[in-house]
Amino acid sequence: MTLRNMALRKTALATALALSCGFSMLAYAHSGATGIVKERMDFFTQNKDDLKAIKTHFRNGDLDAIVPLATQIRDWAEKMPAYFPAGSDGRPSEASPQIWLDFSGFERAANANYQTANQLVIAAKAGDSKAAINAFKATAATCKSCHKSYKLD
């Protein structure tokens, strides 16, 4: 076996291990969640999957495939605050108490995500790759910003 093959095998093994750990952690994080907490966790998982798929579609130059995914992200952002009623914190929820201490700030963060995802929908429908990429980056930035402020580590 060549050094190159050994390196490829090690890389493949490390990738498989990382993925299985990631999926296990996700399953563990969602275990025990019920009701609205489980629903919002599922929406966030779908959102993350949509963002990953959009990245792939950009690489393939398939803006048409981005439209329904960006629409799902936009639609989730619009209804997101309703999935955080008072008293829906505590484990297994990963929601920070800061959401309820600054609910108007949380609503603004969800609206920023809605606006950028809507721009992504518009740009992808128009076939404007540059605008779509910029809107995608802005959408991802709103996710990161919101998680920094409103998600437990």
Regions found by a protein language model. Give the residues of each.
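Processing junctions and N-termini across compartments
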Residues: 23, 137-140
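Sec/Tat signal peptide C-region and signal peptidase I cleavage site
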Residues: 23-31
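The canonical Cys-X-X-Cys-His
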Residues: 139-151
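Bacterial N-terminal signal peptides that target proteins for export
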Residues: 2-15
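Extracytoplasmic c-type cytochrome modules immediately beyond a signal peptide or single-pass transmembrane anchor
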Residues: 30-138
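Bacterial N-terminal signal peptides
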Residues: 12-24
